[in-house]
Amino acid sequence: MPSDILVVAALGRPFTLGALYDARKDKLYPGFTLWEHEVLEESTVESDQPSSTFEITASDSIDDKSSLMDIEASLKASFLGGLIEVGGSAKYLNDTKKFKNQSRVTLQYKATTSFKQLMTNLETKHVEYSEYFQNIEATHVVIGILYGANAFFVFDSDKVDSSNVQDIQGSMEAVIKKIPSVEISGQGSVQLTSEESDITNSFSCKFHGDFHLPSNPTTFEDAVKTYQQLPQMMGKETAVPMTVWLVPMTNFYSEAPQLMADSSTPILRKVRNTLEAMRQLDMRCNDSLERRHSEAGFHCLKKKLKTFQKHYERLHVNPFRKNHFPETFSPSGKGTKMKLQCLPTFRNKLRSPSNINSLNMWMDCAEREINVLRSCIDIIEEAKHKVVLSKSQMARELDDSEVKHAVCYVFTYVTDYDPFLNALSDFSKSIKPKKYSPSKKDYWYTSDDVPEMMREKAHHFYNLAKDMENRCVRFLVASIVNPKEEGAAIHYYREGIQIINDFSNPRIPPVETIQDQESYSGMTVSSPWKETAHPALHLSEGNKKAMSGKPQPSDNNPKRFDHYQQVLCNKGLSKRHYWEVEWCGYVRAGITYKGIQRKTFASECSLGHTDMSWVFDYYPKSGYHHIYNNKKVRVKVASPGFDRLGVYLDWPAGTLSFYMVTSTWVTHLHTFSIRFNEAVYPAFLIGHGQKNANGQIKLKGE
């Protein structure tokens, strides 16, 4: 009779001496034994075997995890096939990294306490045979158990840039190696250097162990305290089976089934390699799903990624679970090694659309698509745009009564349709599915021309948006499938109606010819800046209104005008802006650089008297003028004149224009052509103290 002893890892299973075990399925039959309880107790020999070790690993592979837990090849195959349910510290086997761009370091504490074995001369003595032996497919009997406990502290960093993974992992390993020797102060806190604290604050901790803890550690400091308590918690009464020795059942019962030679190594290697590749694929998919998906286009990609994940889990991972394919891991006949039965199923997987090469190729394409869209979104990130995720949301934006113009950057090729995903779905449902492998020709983003064109349009959209300060113009980003428009387009809407499919440069009419005030509607500027206001200027109505009067006490603020009754707005302008001024009395309105002098009667302090400011003025006795660099030019206006001045700044084009405003119509008065070299500020002179002239302005267009 064969008398080979088999050694297996317990993996949290409730082994007892004399228990029956089917090594072909790695199935334990708890509660069944060949001997009476009294015989087992009389035949048990126990010896102390105290030991403790710790080990650190940065690997997350199933092979290295199995090595830490002393799991041999056949048992590993059963675990991969889902035949055994692990418990206690063995749950560490199921704990895998979620992201590729994540550092992981694991600390193992392992202790043993005692070894129990049955006397070897038991053989058939006192064996209690019964009919149930004919129904139990046990191949072995437990004759020895090593007791102890395992503890795994799994430290994970946050998701980081791929270039930093190795550096962070090295830093983590260095500080985790110190855990057995880290000192704890009298106050119970862990003593670390500031650099070590910075490192440990960036990662979390998970615990898998055979110890009963009040609460599991979640931080590095918790882990240190728990680790140092483990030796005191270890005792014979708390120890669990760690390693089990078994002898063939045929030693006691000749009709028992036998375990034949294990020839499953080739298929085991294939299964292991494929499942490891699937784990890597899952992390890549999680990395992509974790990225921001609020932007237009990305919600379609998220939907495709989730569908992809669902299909490969069903087609590639679940087939190795007995609940889905019980015949895969059932014995093909008495005495044979059943794990070989999964070979045909596994070969079918390698020939199917769900083979790992095809899955990785699809994931390469998905990552490429994400990167192309991300590059476009990054370009327009700083533009004041709004993402539109549905047709109804688009309609709401366009129907907004305040919006007269809308410019929309549209991803035209982003869709949730995918031929490869359809093939995966077909394969899972059909008896004779079609063969299919993803081809780069199926995907637009694998070319160079289309992504480059999309980025060019993204730059153009950004330039349009960044130069516009107009509440009546809205910039949107959306995904609208249209194969006729390659990759991306810029749509222009006017009052909710699409006017242009591929909007390039907006046609800005010459400033001298504009007559409709609506051309400028919605462009805004900020209110006058109280800190700059001359003491004789009184601001009201949220600083929108300013009038001259009796000087008030004021501080000696260096920003304040001390001599000329002037005030600036508080925000510099460097885009396109329009504002209106209701005025009366002695008034000037225009723009200036921030560096205008504030504390002197000299001409460089007065608006329009240097090359730093451009203004239009009104004085009841002399009429209207435009002034620049101390050159004052009269502008003829028909009687009775006007009390509302429109000012249009086109900073990018280098123009400043003034208009007479009546109702909704404007009449061009004058345009300065200027080469701006910095932001400019709306500025006003209101009244003149020496001339005993008062003035008043009220700012519109805010």
Swiss-Prot record:
Q: Please give the chief subcellular localization of this protein.
A: secreted
Protein name listed in UniProt: Cytolytic toxin-beta
A GO molecular function term, named singly, is:
toxin activity
Q: What does this protein do?
A: This heterodimer induces potent hemolytic activities (when tested on rabbit erythrocytes, EC(50)=25-56 ng/mL) due to its ability to form pores in the cell membrane. The pore may be composed of 10 alpha/beta heterodimers. The toxin shows cardiovascular effects that include a vasorelaxant action that may involve the L-arginine-nitric oxid synthase pathway. In addition, it displays edema-inducing activities, increases vascular permeability. It also shows myotoxic activities and interferes irreversibly with neuromuscular function.
> Which superkingdom does the taxonomy of this entry point to?
Eukaryota
Q: How does it assemble?
A: Heterodimer of alpha and beta subunits; non-covalently linked. Also associates into tetramers or even higher aggregates.
The ranges of region (Structural MACPF/CDC pore-forming domain) come to 2-264
Q: Where is this chain's protein located in or outside the cell?
A: Secreted
Region Structural FAT domain, residue ranges: 265-387
Ranges where the B30.2/SPRY domain occurs: 504-702
Region (Thioredoxin (THX) domain) spans which residues?
A: 388-515
| Post-translational modifications reported in the UniProt record | Intrachain disulfide bonds may be present in the heterodimer.
- Return the InterPro entries for the record: B30.2/SPRY (IPR001870), B30.2/SPRY_sf (IPR043136), ConA-like_dom_sf (IPR013320), Cytolytic_pore-forming_toxin (IPR052090), PRY (IPR006574), SNTX_MACPF/CDC-like_dom (IPR056072), SPRY_dom (IPR003877), Stonustoxin-like_helical (IPR048997)
Indicate yes or no for the key word Secreted.
Answer: yes
Per the UniProt entry, the glycosylated residues are 94, 101, 286
Q: To which protein family does this belong?
A: Belongs to the SNTX/VTX toxin family.
Q: Which UniProt keywords apply?
A: Cytolysis, Disulfide bond, Glycoprotein, Hemolysis, Myotoxin, Neurotoxin, Secreted, Toxin
Q: Name one GO biological process term.
A: killing of cells of another organism
Is NAD one of the keywords?
no
Comment field on protein domains: The first domain (residues 2-265) is structurally homologous to the membrane attack complex-ferforin/cholesterol-dependent cytolysin (MACPF/CDC) pore-forming domain. It makes numerous contacts with the FAT domain and comprise essentially the core pore-forming machinery.
Listed under GO cellular component are: extracellular region
Q: In which tissues does this protein get expressed? A: Expressed by the venom gland.
